[in-house]
Amino acid sequence: MKWLILVLMLGCAHAPATSSYFDNTGRDDASTGGVRLIPITTPKGTFNVWTKRVGNNPRIKVLLLMGGPGCSHEFWEALDSYFPQAGVEYYYYDQLGAGFSDNPDQPELWDLARYVEEVEQVRQALKLDHDNFYLVGISWGGLLATEYALKYQQHLKGLVISSMMSSIPAYNDYAKRVLEPAMDPAQLAEIQQLEADGKTETPRYEELLMPFYMQHVLRMPFEKWPWNVLRSFLTLNRKMYVMMQGPSEIGASGTLEKWDRFDQLKTIVTPTLVIGGKYDTMDPDYLEKMTHQLQKARHVVCPHGSHMSLYDDQKIYTSSLIQFIEDVDQGRF
């Protein structure tokens, strides 16, 4: 009987935490299921960006930055299976020009510095601060998160740079030294010829890229790629992607081509997780080197993962992400 009473007491003790996580009392987004459109001021006018909150935790609030540039938030939806159980409050967010957000189709707005200011405006609107704000970005989102931290780290409690080197020149060097030599020479030559001829919007170009993508972007047969990943790609703002990144994931040739912040990483004192996959398009050794440059950092390599380790090494990726957040929250980092 005493054992039964103890079990019931423990169950009751856990219940308030669970119920509080789903408590929307006083939330102005309760009637929309957590969705909120945030007006963003830009040099070209004011536009709305889409966000959606999941959960309620005053101590831990995670803003998710998607990659691309130009992809939408759906990629992150796998976290629905993990974050609620860990009590993590998190926010989906489509950047301007992507997904459910406004797309003014003005290339002047596809600018890194402007996107940093956009993230800051989103932070202010969502009332995230140094006591609870974790910024998580993958690929281009990791680049954007790095740039944000360099300017606004006073607002951050934790930073996650996922599958993103802090130097595009170093990324391009890795692509030339390691990634391209491992490709089929005939296919690589045809890819490069199509790029030289300006024929990167053709089915043949996409067909030639798929073996590389299934090796280094998401290590699954294409027919098994999760639907939410495909949706994120299907809604890709291709014009933005090509302008900023270039036509493919084999290096970068767009307006971000000369971006390099490695030397500035030492100024970031925010606790940081640098995470990537063993088979990533991003050099795992370089990611480790970044952690030595940062003031307070941890490096995780997902041993079965690629650029999207959230899907091809999901348990390692999600457990590492949650462990980092909990360690920072509990003062163990």
Residue map of PLM features:
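N-terminal cap/lid segment of alpha/beta-hydrolase-fold proteins
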Residues: 24-48
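Conserved HGGG/HGGXW glycine-rich cap/lid loop of the alpha/beta-hydrolase fold
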Residues: 47-103
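Active-site loop/oxyanion-hole signature of alpha/beta-hydrolase fold enzymes
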Residues: 95-136, 140
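Conserved hydrolase catalytic core segment
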Residues: 131-174
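Flexible "cap/lid" loop of the alpha/beta hydrolase fold
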Residues: 159-199
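Alpha/beta-hydrolase
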Residues: 186-266, 270
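Conserved loop-alpha-helix segment in the C-terminal half of the alpha/beta-hydrolase fold
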Residues: 262-304
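Catalytic active-site module of serine/aspartate enzymes centered on a nucleophile-bearing elbow/loop
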Residues: 297-333
